[in-house]
Amino acid sequence: MALTKEIIENTIQPHGGTLINREVNAELKETMLEVSHSMPAITLNPWSLSDLELIGIGGFSPLTGFMNEADYNEVVENLHLKNGLVWSIPITLPVTEDKANELEIGESIALYGEDNHLYGVLELEEKYTYDKEKEAAFVYGTTDIEHPGVLKVYEKGSVYLAGPIHLVDRPKHDEFVDYHLDPSETRQLFYDLNWKTVVGFQTRNPVHRAHEYIQKAALESVDGLLLNPLVGETKSDDIPAAVRMESYEVILKNYYPENRTRLVIYPAAMRYAGPREAILHATVRKNYGCTHFIVGRDHAGVGDYYGTYDAQTLIAQYEDELGIQILKFEHAFYCNVCENMATAKTCPHDASEHLHLSGTKVREKLKNGESLPKAFSRPEVADVLIKGLQEK
């Protein structure tokens, strides 16, 4: 979808200044489908396929393809692209050494999904090896293979392919078709709604009461809220995206103003890179048209690998460069005395009266077959989660 000059001028500037679109038109798609059978080919795992999609639709603007070695090294070591633009996570295409040896620089490489469907074409400009231990240590802050993101690093091929991509076809996301909007479409949506300021919220968990509290606090000072849940690959013990999406529908319908909230999927894989992933999440939401982004406790964290507010500390160092306003919230809790949600800034009562909420605790209770108290979750949401996980 092409944006008009008026929309471009009246929505936040994309990261790097231009909203990238690498999706081919119908004529070129037909040509690429015909010639792809004669191209060397590789099969993308779900993680790489989601990266391909986000490059193609502009979610990862200004990237036009998978990173070359110069950009990769600069991102890993200094959180910037070679051109000086802030970028925190390497977006790369790994293959085995044997596969890399079959491919020649200058070739067009057909990119298939695990369903044997053609999704894209890579114009191969570069092949390079990388240090897995270094990538893990710099990006994830640990080399412990118990960390799900680090494990992915060690499992993937030892060579990266680089070059611009063409998005030939899109993963369907059939379950979420009503909520599948590209960055150009969300920008059009915000313009049509006359939202000058929009706060984005990233989540891979159901919306519990602490989430609701900080979202509504943010909504007091902006025109609209974009609830933008990640629906790509996550850990096996995370709540399935389809169940989460139903829970989002229920809570928005019953507890949020319809004219000031929108639900749109974020079709990315979860990296669990904590502070660095918080920067990526903010960057992507800027590309989707958000002017503000919420960073709460342990953003994009897993286990005890990151401190409670490490993500807030790191992203604050790059906020001016990012060009999106970061809204930092303390850990919210339910106070039995206040009989309401609060934070340490607003509640005077002893910690023994505080019920701390988290996605982990919600998952644990559901896994153990426990009911979710009203202080934890809206009853309609709890019903959806319990039913969905029983069916799973």
Swiss-Prot record:
It is an enzyme of class 2 (transferase). SUPFAM superfamilies: Nucleotidylyl transferase (SSF52374), PUA domain-like (SSF88697). It catalyses: sulfate + ATP + H(+) = adenosine 5'-phosphosulfate + diphosphate. Its EC number is 2.7.7.4. GO terms for molecular function: ATP binding; sulfate adenylyltransferase (ATP) activity. Belongs to the sulfate adenylyltransferase family. PANTHER family: PTHR43509, SULFATE ADENYLYLTRANSFERASE (PTHR43509:SF1). This is Sulfate adenylyltransferase. It comes from Staphylococcus saprophyticus subsp. saprophyticus (strain ATCC 15305 / DSM 20229 / NCIMB 8711 / NCTC 7292 / S-41).
